[in-house]
Regions:
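Extreme N-terminal basic, low-complexity initiation segments
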Residues: 2-7
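Non-heme Fe(II)-dependent double-stranded beta-helix
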Residues: 9, 13-71, 77-193
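Non-heme Fe(II)/2-oxoglutarate
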Residues: 9, 13-53, 102, 233-245, ...
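Short, solvent-exposed loop/turn segments at secondary-structure junctions
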Residues: 80-82, 161-168, 179, 217-220, ...
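Active-site rim elements
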Residues: 128-134, 198-199, 248-252, 271-273
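A structural signal for short, well-ordered beta-strand segments
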Residues: 159-161, 211-213, 284-288
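Catalytic core of non-heme Fe(II) oxygenases with the double-stranded beta-helix
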Residues: 170-255, 295-301
Length: 320
């Protein structure tokens, strides 16, 4: 079933039984008319979003680098044209339909109604899909990453992202994508260890950067990413949901238009927020390792598809 686009958003055009309808998938559990849901919806409509959020132009590379280093994230608008937005939305919708039909109760793999694009693939990546391959050649992305990393020798880690269905009524706890290595237990992804005990991962330059692309408008109600500015270098304990102050829950990257790019230092604290709309919110991404940082990668693209890529894209995915 193909995607139905409306007002810059992706609407799920299938029911749990796979029958085409005007009703979107989602809203398992609490009803959208539940008093608590309606109260939260009113609260978010009034208060949600980072105050003074800057959406930069694609030519403001210097400012983008400056804001990224200060805040741990930056948003650049008009990175994708309308055709690219449609291609990306269609590609996301293919995965969303496949995953949603396998999970009729919307349990998710990142919490209720929440899913990882990478987590739905054996390779932890969607690099085999043309929609994600297209993103490798976005000009402004390479300009900004080269400036941040100080080199063109960065590589692709994965082509992933996440989506949340309407009816994701709960907040996801704040977290960081990377941690220091620790003895005992399971070593986290992209961990770092200083045997002298002097330097933390948070004292280093960004080890890897996540590039999120928006195939739909991100609004106050459809599950915007909450991002806590300046936390990429913080050694403080990340608060749980009970400890988290209200201002952090409202510190979301919205409103942001379809076609925008959000670059994130993955060390910064971030988390999912409620999607109280009637449309799925998708944020596909590309993840890049700094030239000095490496860890084992799972191949995510066939050699046949690799040969079809541009020279620039081939350089990025040479270990993917």
């Amino acid at each position: 079933v193909g995607p139905r686009l409306h007002q810059g958003g992706i609407e799920m055009p299938v029911t749990k039984a796979g029958v085409e309808t005007r009703e979107p998938i989602g809203w398992s559990g609490k009803s959208k008319d539940d008093p608590q849901v309606l109260e939260l919806k009113t609260h978010l409509e009034t208060n949600n979003g980072i105050k003074g959020l800057q959406i930069l132009g694609s030519n403001e590379v210097d400012e983008a680098v400056s804001l990224f280093k200060r805040d741990g994230f930056v948003v650049i608008g008009d990175v994708l044209n309308s055709e690219q937005i449609d291609i990306l939305a269609s590609g996301c919708n293919e995965v969303i339909n496949e995953v949603a039909l396998l999970d009729p109760d919307n349990h998710g793999n990142r919490g209720s109604h929440r899913y990882s694009f990478g987590g739905s693939s054996l390779t932890r990546s969607q690099l085999h899909r043309p929609a994600w391959q297209m993103l490798l050649d976005v000009p402004v992305l390479s300009k900004i990453l080269t400036r941040i990393f100080g080199s063109t020798d960065y590589i692709l880690r994965a082509a992933s992202g996440d989506f949340c269905l309407p009816g994701a009524v709960d907040y996801q706890p704040l977290y960081s994508d990377v941690n220091d290595w620790f003895e005992g237990g399971k070593t986290p992804f992209s961990s770092f260890f200083d045997w002298r005990g002097q330097i933390s991962l948070r004292d280093l330059p960004a080890p890897y950067i996540c590039a999120n692309f928006l195939p739909q408008d991100v609004t106050r109600l459809n599950g915007a990413t909450r991002q806590i500015p300046g936390t990429q270098n913080s050694r403080a304990k990340i608060p749980n949901l009970k400890e988290e102050p209200e201002w952090m829950k409202l510190s979301t990257v919205c409103p942001a238009p379809a076609g925008a790019l959000m670059l994130r230092d993955v060390r910064a604290w971030h988390g999912g927020t409620p999607n109280l709309s009637d449309a799925t919110r998708a944020i596909p991404n590309l993840e890049f390792y700094a030239p000095w940082f490496r860890e084992p990668l799972v191949p995510g693209i066939s050699y046949q598809d690799y040969k079809k890529l541009s020279v620039h894209a081939q350089q990025l995915v040479r270990f993917s």
